[in-house]
Amino acid sequence: MGKISVAEIKELMKSTGVGMMDCKKALEANDGDMDKAIEFLREKGLATQAKKSSRAAAEGIVTAVVEGNVGVLLEVNTETDFAANTDDIKNFVNAVANTIIKQNPADVEALKAMTIDGGTATVADVLTELAGMKIRENIVIRRFVRMEGVLASYIHNGGSIGVMVKLDTELSADKVAVIGKDVAMQSAALNAPYIRREDVPAEVLEKEKEIILAQMAEDPKMSSKPEQVKTKIAEGKVGKYYSENCLLEQAFVKDTTGKLSVQGYVDAEAKALGGTIKVVDVIRYERGEGVEKKEDNLADEVAKMMNK
């Protein structure tokens, strides 16, 4: 048979939802026969995966792996928590994390084109086979961050939340490991949007001040107070905003007195170790955050089954 045309490839892509190169290969392998090409893709699990890819994947695993001075925080989503807890998914996630550590991809698409760690196939091919032939659910490599330096991590509840912390210190990584993990746990628990007050955008702070002043103007108790007192109260409210929204100014969750901030904890531990520690970066992933998850009720499920 002659060369496969672009029109034929587009037709197969439209009918199956499979990518261009896979459709081209399927047509070439079957002498341009469209029906056989579709069957070929189904046998490979590609057509099945294409149909599944439209379904919301909001469950899954967040994992963190640190090897020496290189670490990765990775989120892989599945449709159900049952699938996320299978050995197949866990092994895949670990292999992908190690691929990121060793090969340093620029983004998810670059990652998919790489040979998976410990195997011979690409990450994309392994993902397709896993989704189409084994798990039979939509599986999505959603995001990752690769960091270098003195790192610590914390994974909450088997992969529902993951945090990676980068520290600047002259102390060895093993000496500051517990401190870094404690900071990561703090982030996991209270999810501060900023590390320190300097990180709060000027427009966000200005808006917060406007809200504070508006609240004070509506409070009848404030009308009789001197301007100096009002200013002090407003400053106190801004300080409270910082203590709630800036990680290092939050009350340290492990301190039972409620008087020690996260920064105070880090400084005290650094002094005890004879060095300095600065929290440089904190990345927090929460499984499925921002992914729209359709909630089906029982009646809908029964109706779907009856209409099949």
Predicted feature descriptions by range:
Residues 2-308:
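N-terminal assembly/interaction segments in proteins that build large macromolecular machines
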